[in-house]
A protein has these predicted regions:
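Amphipathic, small/basic residue-rich leader segments at the start of a protein or domain
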Residues: 1-82, 104, 108, 257-265, ...
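Internal helix-loop-helix
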Residues: 43-107, 111-112, 154-160, 271, ...
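Glycine-rich phosphate/cofactor-binding loops in nucleotide/flavin-utilizing enzymes
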Residues: 63, 67-68, 227-228, 232, ...
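A short, Trp-centered hydrophobic/proline-enriched beta-strand micro-motif
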Residues: 112-120
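A structural signal for short hydrophobic beta-strand segments in well-ordered beta-sheet cores
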Residues: 134-137
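A short core secondary-structure module
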Residues: 142, 146-188
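Glycine-rich beta->alpha junctions and the first turn(s) of the following alpha-helix
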Residues: 186-275, 338
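Loop-to-helix element that buttresses phosphate recognition and phosphoryl-transfer chemistry
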Residues: 254, 262-287, 301-304, 310-315
Length: 362
């Protein structure tokens, strides 16, 4: 299918079908709105393009998924955060889950009937993910999971979790499971962050019983799964977030009375550089390339562009961030984490230096 024609048809459909969010801007309202948008797009087949037929999709280029995300997020119909979970976890299920499980579960995610979360980081294992300690112990046809995760986005609203556990020492001792969040022994505690939103959670697993058929891949495949998952965070997910940042740039220009051309130019240049890089990444993914450590470049560029944009907004909208309880304040505070979440910028630069430039460890 021609991407330009697809985008034009989608835009026409969105113009004719009102999916405008309501006045409630709480996190819970954002989650409900995301489900509403996904359901409408899935019922009209838009959400199914770019996904394999065996997982409930309609096939076609992967690029079509990026187009849908760009239009939905760029128009402000849904927030980029919940959308990113879909674009990260659905490919993971398709690649690692038993085919019958993927065929059953992926349509639930695409259609907005369910939201899933990603149980990776722990109190002592963030960027150093390989040190995770949540343990899974075999018990007949089940596995018993005990441990704690943290910074788990949207866990309080999630039906399932893609969970990394420790089954043996080292990288080869990490195993992934697909866990129902209503399983006895799971406790979710939302964390209030400085921007006032309970997006992140602590999740406790106290002798949680998970059937062996819910393992993703084989024992020890968890590290490979994580390495395959992270590039998806930096491909289609980033494309949506870029659309969101461009919409904020447009809003900044509309709201300011004194334009600082130099500051705006620098912010725009950072966004444009990011978009050009991400566009190349989209085309590589669409062409079947297996993304790797080079997506760390995309991650560094995104963090730089996001913080530059909201730093510019702070300078051009005096008091909007410091004195007013506005969305600019919330977004500025959230942007401070752009160099931390998904792997810190320091870690990304180390990856670029060691794995792309072969500069060694010193």
């Amino acid at each position: 299918m021609n991407v330009s024609e697809f985008q034009a048809d989608l835009r026409a459909w969105l113009d004719d079908n009102d999916l405008t969010p309501g006045a409630d801007h709480s996190l819970e309202a954002h989650i409900k709105q995301f489900g509403r948008v996904c359901a409408a797009l899935y019922d009209a087949d838009w959400m199914r393009y770019g996904w394999p037929v065996e997982a409930g999709g309609l096939g076609g280029p992967v690029m079509l998924r990026a187009v849908v995300g760009e239009e939905v997020v760029g128009r402000g119909l849904a927030e980029p955060g919940p959308y990113s979970m879909l674009e990260v976890l659905a490919p993971t299920m398709i690649d690692y889950a038993p085919p019958e499980l993927a065929a059953e579960m992926v349509p639930r995610l695409l259609s907005g009937r369910e939201l899933w979360c990603q149980g990776f980081s722990e109190p002592g294992s963030g960027s150093d993910l390989a040190s995770l300690s949540t343990r899974a112990t075999p018990d007949g046809d089940n596995w018993i999971i005990k441990g704690q995760k943290v910074w788990t986005s949207f866990a309080q609203y999630s039906t399932r979790c893609v969970l990394l556990t420790r089954t043996a020492p080292g990288h080869d001792g990490i195993t992934a499971f697909f866990v129902d969040m209503d399983t006895p022994g799971i406790t979710v505690r939302p964390l209030r962050t400085m921007h006032g939103v309970d997006e992140f959670c602590e999740v406790y697993f106290d002798d949680v019983v998970v059937p062996a058929e819910r393992m993703l891949g084989k024992p020890g495949d968890g590290w490979r799964l994580a390495m395959d998952l992270l590039p998806f965070e930096r491909s289609t997910c980033f494309w949506q977030r870029i659309a969101y940042l461009y919409s904020r740039m447009d809003r900044l220009i509309a709201e300011t009375t004194e334009t600082d051309d130099a500051e705006l130019g620098e912010a725009y240049l950072a966004l444009h550089t990011l978009r050009c890089r991400s566009r190349a990444t989209q085309h590589r993914l669409d062409g079947g390339t297996r993304l790797g450590p080079d997506t760390s470049i995309d991650k560094v560029l995104l963090a730089t562009a996001e913080q530059k944009l909201f730093d510019t907004a702070r300078g051009m909208l005096p008091g909007a961030i410091e004195l007013n309880d506005s969305s600019w304040r919330t977004e500025f505070l959230y942007s401070r984490a752009a160099t931390i979440y998904g792997g810190t910028s320091e870690i990304q630069r180390n990856i670029i230096a060691r794995r792309l430039l072969d500069l060694g460890k010193e």
